[in-house]
């Protein structure tokens, strides 16, 4: 390690150690913590994120990859060719004429890639009207046709022949292997194989979409989404080769789609790793140059909330940034109210789509990210994290292959069990507020208008992070509708505002995340009329103050509250202040509790 770097690291270490020392009121030499280890954060995949990355990391790794070259970790374009990513928007669930009008407006407003979602309302027979005025050789198409992909493909082929032009790029989106994971509609594997055989005879057409978002919808970690997607891709290639296609032709039929969340650096690395691992597969199969399969990115449905949906705009901005910087071929930003059936009441669909589209355009046109080749490249952190995540994802892929491949692992229940376990951990992290969701388990807006009951329905096939807390809010809304007020709990602030404010703020925020209104009567002193009045009016209270205040007046406050007939006494803080006390609270509210379970119990007690 260079001497200058070593000295800088030592200076940094002393500065950080000084913070710990001041917190513990000790000298630096006396603190009983390993500062470096204390600051390491471990991801759900088991990747340790160090507090600092420097040139020292380069000596342990090989940061030699360049953009546009195998294994394409740093993207598929070389210096000077970067023109950004495609802006994808999906259309459907409307009349063909309305869809056509929306498509033309979107193309004139910055959309470059057109997605189509088919249903009973919008079928293959409607494509001619929907695509009127669209140049198929200029606008890439991404199809979501469920079980009718064959009909849609035939209709598109006919339109292209009628126009006498090849497709700019057409992904038919057949996804039977991944669709079985989240229950989404798709063709059979036999139909998918035949689609690919037919598509292989046409230019710029790929039949197969390995849809990693299906794994994300069911709670997959980043490594799992990548590893399972690569395994599914290999399964498709094997089936296509068995059907008579050459390995080269089979590889040309595969495209990928990944879900991106607002965990910025993890998502940048996820897309980089996915390309690297697929490149390795292509290399083993003898065609390393075919590793440049399209990589579609879409904002993850799991991260979208129904409550305070405006925050979803911010989540989507970070996710789209990560996808673009990570090297996605194109990026689709879902509308901010995607989790709400029919959207936010009173908000037009045009507005929601415009904001989603403009999120991409802001990143491309105002921030100029599209003019930079691999913006994250060369970052010691991103390169190191990419390497570590690649190891974890390859381990997932290898484990699936060891079971006989993707289909065998699905049939045995291995894939489901893997996703269930990861989801339960995510759910627990949200419940304990270790995983923070703004507007949901942190900083909720209890004053927002309740959603109508028919718009609180959970999206099918998606395990949303916010669902458990939003179920509590739904209970609160029902209570409000019936009683004219929300369920309430009274706080008992001890000491002056400057002392109790931190914990009254914490308590208000926590209770609001469960739909409970916290009543703050201001500073109360045990033994006074104001204290007695507040206690007598409350069935459940939360005592709020400093640890010092608890030591001085906490036991007396609890005793007076019991004498006043309070049914349940909670305290904001840790149990240590009441160890061995004859008058201890019934429970504690702090950062270590299962907040979702605690709030559900409180709603039960309040009759909500």
Where are these regions (language model features)?
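Intrinsic disorder at enzyme termini
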Residues: 1-18, 23-24, 35, 39-41, ...
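Short glycine/threonine-rich loop-to-helix capping motif typified by GTGT followed
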Residues: 221-226, 261-273, 300-314, 343-353, ...
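Hydrophobic alpha-helix feature that most strongly marks membrane-spanning transmembrane helices
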Residues: 273, 279, 283-286, 318-325, ...
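Short beta-alpha connecting loops at secondary-structure transitions
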Residues: 141, 179-184, 217-219, 299-309, ...
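Catalytic alpha/beta active-site cores
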Residues: 1-263, 293-294, 330-334, 487, ...
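Accessory "access/gating" subregions that flank catalytic or transport cores
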Residues: 234, 241-244, 252-260, 272-290, ...
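Conserved, mostly hydrophobic/aromatic
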Residues: 46, 110, 164, 278, ...
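Flexible glycine/proline-rich, aromatic-decorated loop/lid segments
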Residues: 288-298, 307-341, 348-369
